[in-house]
Amino acid sequence: NPPAIFKSYCEIIVTYFPFDEQNCSMKLGTWTYDGTVVAIYPEGPRPDLSNYMQSGEWTLKDYRGFWHSVNYSCCLDTPYLDITYHFILLRLPLYFIVNVIIPC
């Protein structure tokens, strides 16, 4: 089992449905501890997908992780770290055709 399962909301833009692709992001960081106390770094430019479960409706077209260090106006000498992952999801139209169009 993975150490954690994250569920996230992604706004879907349906302009080209069912031949669309979506860009979903997930930002991981901490507001409790700053970058002088905790260090977070991605293991590489792409997330580990060893526990990824494929879907009949979507496929991963691209995915990357980016490390950020931000100094906010409240505390300019204190960095706050995060890793933001971007996932480009490509809809598989066969799922829509088989489950919606054909039954009609």
Swiss-Prot record:
Recorded hits in SUPFAM superfamilies, A to Z, give: Nicotinic receptor ligand binding domain-like
Q: Which residues are glycosylated?
A: N23
Membrane topology (Extracellular)? 1-104
The entry's localization annotation reads: Postsynaptic cell membrane; Cell membrane
Output the Gene Ontology cellular-component terms: postsynaptic membrane
Give the protein name, as stated in the record. Answer: Acetylcholine receptor subunit alpha
Q: Gene of origin?
A: CHRNA1
Which keywords accompany this UniProt record? Cell membrane, Disulfide bond, Glycoprotein, Ion channel, Ion transport, Ligand-gated ion channel, Membrane, Postsynaptic cell membrane, Receptor, Synapse, Transport
As its record notes, the protein acts as a catalyst of:
K(+)(in) = K(+)(out); Na(+)(in) = Na(+)(out)
**PROSITE patterns hit by this protein:** NEUROTR_ION_CHANNEL
What the protein does? Upon acetylcholine binding, the AChR responds by an extensive change in conformation that affects all subunits and leads to opening of an ion-conducting channel across the plasma membrane.
MF-aspect GO terms: extracellular ligand-gated monoatomic ion channel activity; transmembrane signaling receptor activity
Q: Which family does it belong to?
A: Belongs to the ligand-gated ion channel (TC 1.A.9) family. Acetylcholine receptor (TC 1.A.9.1) subfamily. Alpha-1/CHRNA1 sub-subfamily.
- How does the record describe its quaternary structure? One of the alpha chains that assemble within the acetylcholine receptor, a pentamer of two alpha chains, a beta, a delta, and a gamma or epsilon chains.
Membrane topology category: Multi-pass membrane protein
Q: Which residues pair up as cystines?
A: C10-C24, C74-C75
